[in-house]
Amino acid sequence: MKNIPVVLMGCGGVGRQLLQHIVTCRSLHANQGIRLRVVGVCDSKSLVAAPDVYSMELSDNLLLEVCRVKLDSSSSLLTLNGECQVYSNSELTKKIIDIAALLGLALVDCSASSETIGVLNRVVDIGCCAVLANKKPLTSKMEDYDKLVSHPRFIRHESTVGAGLPVIASLNRLLSSGDPVHRIIGSLSGTLGYVMSEVEDGKPFSQVVKSAKSLGYTEPDPRDDLSGMDVARKALILARLLGQRLNLDSIKIESLYPEEMRPGVMSAEEFLGSGVSLLDKDIQERVHKASLNGNVLRYVCVIEGSRCEVGIQELPKDSALGRLKGSDNVLEIYSRCYFEQPLVIQGAGAGNDTTATGVLADILDLQDLFP
């Protein structure tokens, strides 16, 4: 039986779903000759670890208890009952590195923190593996990024772009086979994909944003989605894969709300109550203009040469992006082999379940690196 020791950072929606997947897939993995030994789980305040990480692991019952406790985001892992050791925030990073040095583990980052880059780099540097759903380490400054990806065999981050869709794997296959990618255009936000396809049908922008929030498609403050920053991070990850030496502030980002409506100036309640409706006319006019040209509006990332930008683009109705409905992600990749007809990747590109499934697949993809 091949044993893969795992430490999980981040107990939010994706992290909890991953733990549930690991538990429910025990018999499947056993049939494949694999055992995922979860030896530690941490949130921003504490680390829960097996008493003896070399010979023990956190029980499935304890992992499910973690999921239950962390359903309330304000709850701490310190309240857990079970056979485990608990380490405080000040000990957290050192303990993870100690466990990594002892076991040669897979460190899984399902947090949304920009603070994990240090421990990820240390762990990879000592020959361990890292699996990321967290985009922030991969969109940090180039110096930190270069360190993180300096051992590409040890890194997997499929779920950072397109959740469980095979975006990163497809790009890597093209690039490693000598098929240069010269253009990528994609709708990489389920929220903004939904918004743009709904306003195309004549619905007011404000109504669509509120509907998206009620359906759970947006963050608690929809401006976190409407700013385009999440799409920009995904675009930067793809651009860097293609070899571009870019930072986040190099990307041209079109926000769907003006500066005077940004957080800190206007509250989320004010934005939803009165601010967002002031944007209806402009969006409606842009939709109408595109329609006259036989086109539709989509919020996309475009990567071509040294160009990397995100924003609203007019696109043909009969293209893969033009036909997009709902919250799916669509990515068109143009290369030497896919010159006239692009490689199109489409499917659910958001959701805790889909993202966690992608993370689990990444962990299993590293199995040949473990004894």
Residue map of PLM features:
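N-terminal glycine-/serine-/threonine-rich beta1-alpha1-beta2 phosphate-ribose binding loop
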Residues: M1-D125
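Glycine-enriched alpha-helix->loop->beta-strand junction motifs that scaffold or abut catalytic
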Residues: I126-A130, G190
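Rossmann-fold NAD(P)-binding glycine/threonine-rich loop
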Residues: S113-I126, K135-L174
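NAD(P)-dependent dehydrogenase/reductase Rossmann-like domain
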Residues: M1-L8, G12-R26, Q32, R37-G40, ...
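A generic secondary-structure micro-motif detector
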Residues: D109-C110, N134-K135, D225, V276
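Hydrophobic residues within beta-strands of alpha/beta enzymes
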Residues: A130-V131, I184
